[in-house]
UniProtKB/Swiss-Prot annotation:
Its main location: mitochondrion. The keyword Transcription does not apply. InterPro entries: SDH, SDH_sf, SDHAF2. It is found in: Mitochondrion matrix. It comes from Aedes aegypti (Yellowfever mosquito). This is Succinate dehydrogenase assembly factor 2, mitochondrial.
Length: 161
């Protein structure tokens, strides 16, 4: 049972939400390097919420390749988090059309099988090691894309047409 308490002081509203201890469990703590001079690394805490099961992704059977690529383009753009939206939409704009059937299937699995979008981001940026089932030619292409050797501006998603 959670508790929500709202209070008003000097014209401002504040809310306190107390969650049960079982709803949040810490699985690991990583240190993320700081980009600001001599500051020490900041801790990054991974949280797993076991109370909300995410349905297992079911691959679409007999989906035409062009329809699959259209779906993947949409899914690359609509991630629900800005970081992956920018990385995956620019990656898809650059590589998706030239992918063959096998590569398209690998990309489909990469963006739809993991239950946490932050995992995809951390694998692509090298913060966490990539699990064996996703460590393939598409992940290598994505990691190369993330390095941005040509220093392309990626502040918004590319136009569709």
């Amino acid at each position: 049972m959670s508790l929500l308490r709202v209070t008003r002081s000097s014209g401002h509203l504040s809310a306190v939400c107390r969650l049960p201890a079982r709803s949040i469990s810490t699985t690991s703590i990583l240190l993320v390097p700081s980009n600001e001079g001599n500051k020490p690394p900041t801790p990054m805490i991974d949280l797993e919420d076991k109370s909300l099961p995410i349905p297992i992704y079911k691959e679409k059977k007999n989906e035409p390749l062009q329809l699959q690529k259209s779906r993947l383009l949409y899914q690359s753009r609509k991630r629900g988090m800005l970081e992956n939206g920018l990385l995956l939409s620019t990656f898809a704009a650059k590589h998706l059309e030239s992918m063959d059937v096998k590569q398209t299937k690998l990309y489909d699995q990469l963006i739809n099988m993991p239950t946490n979008d932050w995992d995809i981001f951390y694998w692509a940026t090298g913060v966490k090691p990539t699990p064996a089932e996703y460590d393939n030619e598409i992940m290598a292409l994505l990691k190369d894309h993330v390095k941005n050797a040509n220093r392309e501006k990626r502040i918004c998603q590319p136009n569709l047409y």
